[in-house]
């Protein structure tokens, strides 16, 4: 029977994901902090933080794991038709703080948000270090959708996305797929499988298989300008 590990503020070492609990699925450790070194170590090992505002820091590695292969997003004809009609603009790393704020905004389907001010500050630090990145969707000068996540080697670990206009988050996801495919990325970690991710083409992998793929791809190089701040086009 696996037991929960408790982290202190000095050590960044995590227990192996194989020791995560089955109930709740994937809970591996409690405590520690959200300093860049610890966060980068976590993603390198297939672990991510996820907790509510009144909870301690909780670290997870669920089984199964939701993943995409870059370029394999499912797109319906109606979605593509809708996107072709939109006068939207797209960018990379132009408005990271606005994107994470958009993802943290209250939603009618959720009771509160897990993207706490502490989480926002932590990922802003990672962005400043060139480790966390954002995709933006604009209508004129208004940010209407986007997503953010963290890259480790040729693996992109998606964190959250949002939209204020219909299909803007799907446009951001499609742009992410196109960008990662061009840059030679091998895997998108979408963390916890749900019906929405499945409808977009995510696959559920056994944690063991996911970790094996992560180990293959996490140290592979990417172009120095892979995440350069830029205006980009969505190919439809």
UniProtKB/Swiss-Prot annotation:
Principal subcellular localization: cytoplasm
Taxonomic superkingdom: Bacteria
Key words of the record: Acyltransferase, Cytoplasm, Transferase
Enzyme Commission no: 2.3.2.6
Compartment(s) of residence: Cytoplasm
InterPro entries: Acyl_CoA_acyltransferase, Leu/Phe-tRNA_Trfase, Leu/Phe-tRNA_Trfase_C, Leu/Phe-tRNA_Trfase_N
Cytoplasm in keyword set: yes
Any one Gene Ontology BP term: protein catabolic process
One Pfam assignment: Leu_Phe_trans
The reaction(s) this protein catalyses: N-terminal L-lysyl-[protein] + L-leucyl-tRNA(Leu) = N-terminal L-leucyl-L-lysyl-[protein] + tRNA(Leu) + H(+); N-terminal L-arginyl-[protein] + L-leucyl-tRNA(Leu) = N-terminal L-leucyl-L-arginyl-[protein] + tRNA(Leu) + H(+); L-phenylalanyl-tRNA(Phe) + an N-terminal L-alpha-aminoacyl-[protein] = an N-terminal L-phenylalanyl-L-alpha-aminoacyl-[protein] + tRNA(Phe)
Gene3D superfamilies in alphabetical order: Leucyl/phenylalanyl-tRNA-protein transferase, C-terminal domain, Leucyl/phenylalanyl-tRNA-protein transferase, N-terminal domain
Cellular component per GO, a single term: cytoplasm
Similarity remark: Belongs to the L/F-transferase family.
HAMAP family for this protein: Leu_Phe_trans
Function: Functions in the N-end rule pathway of protein degradation where it conjugates Leu, Phe and, less efficiently, Met from aminoacyl-tRNAs to the N-termini of proteins containing an N-terminal arginine or lysine.
The protein's name: Leucyl/phenylalanyl-tRNA--protein transferase
Gene label: aat
């Amino acid at each position: 029977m696996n037991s929960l590990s408790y982290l202190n503020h000095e050590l960044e070492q995590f227990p192996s994901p194989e020791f995560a609990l089955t109930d709740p699925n994937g809970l591996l450790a409690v405590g520690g902090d959200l300093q860049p070194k610890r966060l980068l170590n976590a993603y390198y090992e297939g672990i991510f933080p996820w907790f509510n505002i009144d909870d301690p820091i909780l670290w997870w590695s669920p089984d199964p794991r939701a993943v995409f292969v870059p370029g394999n997003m499912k797109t319906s004809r109606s979605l593509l038709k809708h996107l072709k009609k939109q006068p939207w603009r797209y960018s990379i790393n132009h408005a990271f703080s606005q994107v994470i704020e958009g993802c943290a905004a209250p939603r009618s389907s959720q009771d509160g948000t897990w993207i706490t001010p502490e989480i926002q500050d932590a990922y802003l630090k990672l962005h400043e270090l060139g480790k966390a990145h954002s995709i933006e969707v604009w209508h004129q000068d208004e940010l209407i959708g986007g997503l953010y996540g963290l890259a480790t080697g040729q693996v992109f670990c998606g964190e959250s996305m949002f939209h204020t206009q219909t299909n803007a988050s799907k446009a951001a996801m499609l742009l992410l797929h196109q960008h990662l495919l061009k840059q030679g990325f091998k895997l998108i970690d979408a963390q916890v499988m749900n019906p929405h991710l499945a409808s977009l083409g995510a696959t559920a992998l056994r944690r063991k298989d996911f970790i094996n793929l992560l180990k293959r791809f996490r140290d592979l190089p990417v172009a120095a300008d892979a995440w350069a701040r830029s205006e980009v086009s969505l190919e439809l």
